C-alpha cells in the first residue's frame, strides 16, 4: 500500500486546505468468507498502520462486513493475526459500528473483547450508526471506558443523517458520558446529508455547536 499512496502529496494537499491534523486512517473490513481468508488479509491491514504513522494519525479505523451466518469468527481471527504485525507500532485499531454490519451491537463488541484483550484494539463510537441500530451506547461506554478511542459525531432523524443539533440524538448526553470517563480523543464530525451542497455551512455550524456542548459539559472550550 505504501508503494501506491503518495503520502507526502496527501499531507501537502491537507495543509493547503487548512487541515492541521489527521485523526484517523480508515481501512477495509476483514473478509469473512473464512478464517484463513481473514488471517491472510492481516498483512495488508498492517500496512495501514504505516500509512497512519506517516500521516501523523493515532488510529486506524475499520468496521465489519455485512452481517452473515459466518458471524464474527473470521474478523476476530483476522485481528488476532494482525496484532503481532503491529506490536511495535504505537498506533491503535478502533473498531467502528456500521448499521447492518457484523460490528454493530453491544454484544458484538463483547464477543470481540472476550477473545482480544490487547489494549491496542478499541472502539470508535458512532452516534449515527448506534441510533439507526437502536444500540444502548451508554451501557457500551460504561462497560468499556478504557477502550473508547474515537468518536464519530452525527445527528440523525431515524436512519438519515442531518445537521448537528437538528436531529434526535442526545449529543449532549454523549459528551457528558465521555467527559465522565476522561475521554480526550477526537470529536470527528460526519455529515451524510441529503443536501451536500450545504456541507460548508453545516460544518461551520457543527463546529460552533460542538464547542457549545463541550463548554456546557466541561466548563471550558475545546482546542
Which sequence ranges carry the predicted segments?
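Histidine-acidic metal/acid-base catalytic patches
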Residues: 56, 106-125, 130-223
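Generic detector of contiguous secondary-structure segments
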Residues: 1-3, 166
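Generic alpha-helical scaffold signal
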Residues: 4, 8, 39-42, 204
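Active-site beta-loop-alpha junctions enriched in small/polar residues
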Residues: 1, 26-29, 64-67, 96-100, ...
